[in-house]
Design a protein with these regions (language model features):
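Hydrophobic faces of well-ordered beta-strands that scaffold small-molecule active sites
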Residues: 3-5, 129, 153
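Short, hydrophobic/aliphatic alpha-helical segments
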Residues: 74, 114-127, 198-199
């Protein structure tokens, strides 16, 4: 596996820019090495804000048939989520100096955890369908899987893991700027009127940064998969949040 980097550095004195680039690339190379990937080149430019993007190449052992896909949900599968949700509202609150330090620290620690080990575990336990939860929120990415698989799912809102402080931020009326666009997906929720009053319901549409994996695992192996995720330390807050109903 190899990666090419696009680094965007803020305008500054040359010495300052060089130091930022060294630190940025050192961190990126370290994370890539942990994933068995080599940084082989890239491009650097100056802009108003710091930014870093990667173009990564890799291969799938066993070929494409071994890949976990978005469109492979099967009736009876259990839905597992490997990380809590709520980063959107937490960091929107942090920008307003409304989030408590421990909330942000806990979220950052989770965000810094690679999904690689968790992906291996769910694959070993028979997962055929899997995606990562990012900007479209849990509801948006689950809807992608449902549409691609022509399937229906049932979620248990009480089981969805939340970052500490996420509900507090919601109570303050703070949400991400991307939340309104994601909320439009509520039309896909069959019983919206019955569940929209649940405290954590808005977090289904909360955009995630470095979110966890949403995987469908055969029901008979779901509990063993959950235990493996938690005991390995790769996903200590993983949870079974629902099932594929048809």
């Amino acid at each position: 596996q190899t990666a090419l980097a696009l680094a965007q550095l803020p305008f500054a004195l040359e010495a300052k820019t060089e130091e930022e680039l060294v630190q940025l690339m050192a961190g990126a190379a370290s994370a890539l090495r942990e994933a068995g990937c080599a940084l082989v080149g890239g491009h650097t430019c100056e802009a108003k804000e710091l930014g870093l993007g990667m173009a990564v190449t890799g291969y799938m052992p066993g070929g494409s048939k071994a890949a976990m896909r978005k469109d492979a949900l099967q009736a009876g599968d259990a839905l597992l989520l490997t990380k809590p949700i709520g980063t959107g509202t937490l960091f929107a609150a942090d920008m307003r100096a409304k989030a408590r330090g421990p909330w942000v620290i806990d979220a950052l620690q989770s965000m810094g955890t690679s999904n690689g080990p968790a992906a291996s575990i769910v694959h070993e336990h028979g997962a055929l369908a899997c995606t990562d939860v990012t900007g479209f929120g849990l509801a948006g990415h689950l809807l992608e899987m449902c549409r691609g698989s022509k399937a229906f799912v049932a979620l248990d809102l009480e089981k969805v893991p939340l970052y500490e402080g996420a509900l507090d931020c919601l109570r303050m009326g703070i949400t991400s700027s991307l939340q309104p666009a994601n909320v439009r997906l509520r039309r896909a929720v069959a019983n919206h009127d019955a569940v929209c009053g649940h405290a954590s319901y808005p977090l289904l549409f909360d955009p995630q940064t470095s979110g966890g994996l949403l995987a469908a695992v055969p029901k008979a192996r779901a509990n063993a998969c959950l235990e493996a995720l938690r005991s390995s330390g790769s996903a200590p807050l993983a949870a079974i949040i629902g099932e594929v109903t048809g």
